[in-house]
């Protein structure tokens, strides 16, 4: 794991350089907003001590070096896909979304092994530190306005819960991001439903459902916790009622797999009366996976059907399809190129 990259260790580095609590807060506030570390400490009453000012170049280099851009790829929809290198030369992906959003990674690889996702093919390599997670947001904010952070990149946030929640707390306080605009995505894990309500910052919840059929879900998400869809909805709904914002149910559309009328009918019944929104997401092609996306016409029909049944549904155009913006695709291509160059 990257040395000295947790938020606690970064705080220690600031203190060791001479930062007092007020300076530490101001410097972290500047960093998480994509600004120079001393951006909020230039007035006379907040001026940094001399020793800390002298340490600024080294500190700035350390913070900026947590993630560095290896390559960037802009899509026709104005999505910007970034391949990032960590200090141990592992690579992850972040996606700057059109408008004011960023999708960040929480792990190098993933242990869930979703059959329609590239990231899980190599398994889990390591956890990202809380500092590395926040660094992706800081990097994004240095490039564009960011008002929404979704934890839907590489990795399963529930499997790196402490670091993700530490990052969320900083983003929701010094980062000045609304709680509802911090979106915690998970395949469903009981620890999530226990821990999220306890935090001072309570993010919105996105639940990767993908099907209402337990057996099919076990096939599509082979290492996700075995929790019945109905129980997942009940757990998510309890959290949504407490936070006053809806659960987002993610549903990757796979032709002939989870786009049938039987799925739609069961889904409409399952979510009736619940505080929820369904996000239909057309499948992003993955090499070697025998899946296809349904036609846009069919996907739109599914959305309209749920509307008629009283369930809010949205049809999302997969961001950056022309720049391999599906989780892990850009990283996998980079690995193939690197391997061929070594051969």
Question: Model-predicted segments: where are they?
Answer:
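Short, mixed charged/polar active-site loops
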Residues: 91-93
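Residue-level structural signal for beta-strand termini and adjacent loop
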Residues: 96-97, 163
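Conserved AdoMet/S-adenosylmethionine-binding subsite of the radical SAM
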Residues: 140-309, 314
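Canonical Radical SAM [4Fe-4S] cluster-binding loop centered on the CxxxCxxC motif
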Residues: 97-131, 139
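Auxiliary Fe-S-binding modules of radical SAM enzymes
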Residues: 1-89, 237-245, 253-343
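Alpha-helix N-cap/helix-start and coil->helix boundary motif
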Residues: 111, 189-191, 214, 320-324
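Cys/His-clustered metal-coordination modules, chiefly Zn-binding fingers
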Residues: 135
């Amino acid at each position: 794991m990257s040395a000295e990259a947790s938020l606690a260790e970064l705080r220690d580095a600031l203190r060791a350089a001479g930062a007092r609590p007020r300076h530490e807060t101001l410097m972290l506030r500047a960093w998480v907003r994509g600004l120079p570390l001393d951006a909020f400490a230039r007035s006379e009453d907040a001026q940094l001590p001399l020793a800390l000012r002298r340490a600024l170049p080294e500190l700035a280099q350390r913070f900026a070096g947590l993630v560095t851009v290896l390559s960037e790829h802009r899509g026709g929809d104005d999505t910007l896909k970034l391949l990032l290198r960590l200090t141990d030369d592992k690579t992850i992906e972040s996606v700057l979304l059109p408008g004011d959003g960023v999708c960040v990674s929480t792990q190098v690889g993933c242990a869930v092994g979703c059959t329609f996702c590239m990231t899980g093919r190599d398994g889990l390599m390591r956890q990202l530190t809380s500092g590395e997670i926040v660094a992706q947001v800081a990097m994004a904010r240095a490039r564009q306005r960011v008002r929404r952070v979704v934890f839907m990149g590489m990795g399963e946030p529930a499997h790196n819960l402490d670091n993700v929640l530490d990052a969320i707390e900083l983003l929701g306080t010094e980062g000045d991001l609304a709680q509802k605009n911090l979106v915690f995505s998970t395949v469903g894990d009981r620890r999530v439903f226990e821990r999220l309500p306890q935090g001072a910052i309570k993010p919105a919840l996105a639940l990767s459902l993908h099907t209402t059929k337990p057996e099919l879900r076990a096939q599509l998400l082979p290492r996700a916790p075995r929790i019945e869809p109905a129980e997942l909805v009940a757990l998510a709904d309890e959290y949504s009622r407490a936070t006053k914002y809806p659960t987002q149910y993610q549903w990757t559309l796979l032709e002939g797999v989870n786009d049938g009328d039987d799925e739609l009918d069961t889904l409409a019944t399952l979510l009736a009366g619940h505080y929820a929104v369904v996000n239909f997401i057309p499948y992003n092609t993955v090499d070697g996976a025998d899946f296809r996306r349904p036609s846009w016409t069919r996907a739109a029909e599914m959305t309209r059907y749920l509307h008629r049944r009283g369930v809010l549904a949205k049809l999302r155009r997969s961001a950056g399809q022309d720049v391999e913006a599906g989780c892990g695709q850009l990283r996998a291509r980079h690995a193939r190129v690197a391997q061929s160059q070594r051969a």
